[in-house]
Amino acid sequence: MNIALVAHDKKKDDLIVLIKTYAHILKKHQLFATGTTGKRIAEATGLPVHCFRSGPLGGDQEIGAAVARGEMDMIIFFRDPLTAQPHEPDVSALMRLCDVYSIPLSTNMGGSEILIRSIEQGDFESLKLSHNDEPPA
């Protein structure tokens, strides 16, 4: 699976804790991230991470484009709901695309743990069957 990892500044440490905890599962998949988040994850875990641009410089949009092309299977996005983000429209657009293309999206630790454990159990088989379909009209 192709999994995108994104975190606002105040949530990066939380995301790294999640990735370290589930590295034994995530190492079997391709990890993608926005710039700073990806670099921090790679440094902290040793896992290979393909880095897009930083979120405010278009990284969220790059991940959104990958979703629209059928190239992402899951998004874990630890948002900071208490701090205004200058690129909030990009964040909203990414979340919208996840809904349009039925891509699993989690924005917090609890939901992310469920998604990652579901990967290990093979719970995303129907997603593979419909992954490249056009979105509904």
Swiss-Prot record:
Concerning PROSITE patterns, the annotation shows: METHYLGLYOXAL_SYNTH, MGS
- The residues the record assigns to binding substrate are 8, 12, 34-37, 54-55, 87
- Give the EC number(s) under which this enzyme is classified: 4.2.3.3
Q: Which GO terms describe its molecular function?
A: methylglyoxal synthase activity
Asked if the Swiss-Prot or TrEMBL record annotates the protein with the keyword Lyase, the reply is: yes
Q: What class of enzyme is it?
A: lyase
Q: Which residues form a coiled coil?
A: none
Domain MGS-like: start-end pairs: 1-137
Write out the catalysed reaction: dihydroxyacetone phosphate = methylglyoxal + phosphate
Q: Identify one Gene Ontology CC term for this UniProt entry.
A: cytosol
Please cite one Gene Ontology biological process associated with this protein: methylglyoxal biosynthetic process
Lyase listed as a keyword: yes
Enzyme active site: 60 (proton donor/acceptor)
Keywords, in A-Z order: Lyase
Give the protein's biological function. Catalyzes the formation of methylglyoxal from dihydroxyacetone phosphate.
* Family note: Belongs to the methylglyoxal synthase family.
Q: What is this protein called?
A: Methylglyoxal synthase
Tell me the organism: Exiguobacterium sp. (strain ATCC BAA-1283 / AT1b)
